[in-house]
Amino acid sequence: MLKSLEFEVPMISAIFMLILLIAYFSKKRVKIPENSLFNVIILSSFIMAVLDTIVHIICATNEFSVIMDSYYEFINISNRIFSLLFFIIFSSFTTYLIIISIKKSYDGFNKNKYILGIVWVLYFISTFFFNIDLIEVGNIVNVSGNMMILSYSAITINLVVSIIVSLANIKKKDKRYLPAFLMLLLMVITR
């Protein structure tokens, strides 16, 4: 029995990301740092959407006590993966904005991509020091706890840096900054 239809949005997101993946990877691309970062962003988003759909289906088809007894460990590990993927997506986006802002960063990107990878691994390792708390709000199962605080903090830092870099380069009138401005607008609207 379905408690709620909360899995529909993640499922549609997964389908949309699959279509985007097929369209993006079916075309030939120029090998530049921006495209490498976009590859990471789009693949991470797809993996996250599929895993999110699975977690939401589990939560929508089971009672809270069953989720806590049978699926807690899977959901806990899934949330570590979500946290890492969100961090990868937002740090890749921040790196993308820095690269398009500083011409010299093209050369430095190949050297610094290893540093970015090390930061991702260190962040992922740090997630093992925290667990999640599952809470039931009506028919919906939500996640809270120190793991989420770590995730929100890391993502907020990346968003702030992205917005600062974009605002510092607003005079360039480069359409590549549009995603950062759209994120800022969405954050203002949703508050």
Sequence positions of predicted segments:
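Charged/polar interaction segments and conserved charged motifs
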Residues: 1-6, 96-123, 168-173
